[in-house]
């Protein structure tokens, strides 16, 4: 079966680089499924989970806090400020950070601060949801 090369890169490190049969990720207008030979595409992505079905049938799940997607017929590149492997997600930590952000929202004084905190809240909510869904024993529904 044909494969495509997938790179998921955060501001800090390369999170995944390898061959895959299929990639699913949260596009700006909904979920995107990418197969080998896909039409070239550049798009923003929303916070959520990137699911990679590796060439060996294994699966990688990576939380991204939004970013940019580039698709070429033989490759997929995901660039995100924050990308976290599913095994490293911590729902309790994300919920605690969300509580702090909600407090910051209550104290925000201007539109710029409010917009920044609302974006952070959306990312933290997506991170907590991804952690809950990808928790060992739950599967990736």
UniProtKB/Swiss-Prot annotation:
Give this protein's Gene Ontology molecular function annotations. Answer: ATP binding; proton-transporting ATP synthase activity, rotational mechanism
Pfam assignment, any one: ATP-synt_DE_N
What are the alphabetically sorted keywords of the record? ATP synthesis, Cell inner membrane, Cell membrane, CF(1), Hydrogen ion transport, Ion transport, Membrane, Transport
**Protein's membrane topology:** Peripheral membrane protein
- CDD domains, sorted: F1-ATPase_delta (cd12152)
Tell me, in one coarse class, where this protein mainly resides. Answer: membrane
Q: Which GO terms describe its cellular component?
A: plasma membrane; proton-transporting ATP synthase complex
Chain segments annotated as transmembrane: none
Which InterPro entries does the entry link to? ATP_F1_dsu/esu_C_sf, ATP_synth_F1_dsu/esu, ATP_synth_F1_dsu/esu_N, ATPsynth_dsu/esu_N
PANTHER family named in the record: ATP SYNTHASE DELTA/EPSILON CHAIN (PTHR13822), ATP SYNTHASE EPSILON CHAIN, CHLOROPLASTIC (PTHR13822:SF10)
Under the subunit heading, UniProt states: F-type ATPases have 2 components, CF(1) - the catalytic core - and CF(0) - the membrane proton channel. CF(1) has five subunits: alpha(3), beta(3), gamma(1), delta(1), epsilon(1). CF(0) has three main subunits: a, b and c.
Task: State the function annotated in the UniProt record.
Answer: Produces ATP from ADP in the presence of a proton gradient across the membrane.
By sequence similarity, the record places it as follows: Belongs to the ATPase epsilon chain family.
Indicate what this protein is called per its UniProt record: ATP synthase epsilon chain
- List the taxonomic lineage: Bacteria, Pseudomonadati, Pseudomonadota, Betaproteobacteria, Burkholderiales
């Amino acid at each position: 079966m044909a494969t495509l090369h997938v790179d998921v890169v955060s501001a800090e490190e390369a999170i995944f680089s390898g061959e895959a049969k299929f990639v699913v990720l949260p596009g700006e207008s909904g979920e995107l499924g990418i197969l080998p030979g896909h039409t070239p595409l550049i798009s923003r992505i929303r916070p959520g989970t990137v699911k990679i079905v590796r060439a060996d049938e294994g699966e990688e799940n990576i939380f991204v806090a939004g970013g940019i997607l580039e698709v070429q017929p033989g490759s997929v590149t995901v660039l995100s400020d924050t990308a976290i492997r599913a095994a490293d997600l911590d729902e309790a930590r994300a919920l605690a950070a969300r509580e702090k952000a909600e407090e910051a929202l209550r104290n925000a004084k201007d539109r710029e601060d409010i917009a920044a905190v609302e974006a952070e809240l959306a990312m933290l909510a997506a991170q907590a949801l991804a952690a809950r869904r990808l928790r060992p024993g739950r599967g990736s529904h």
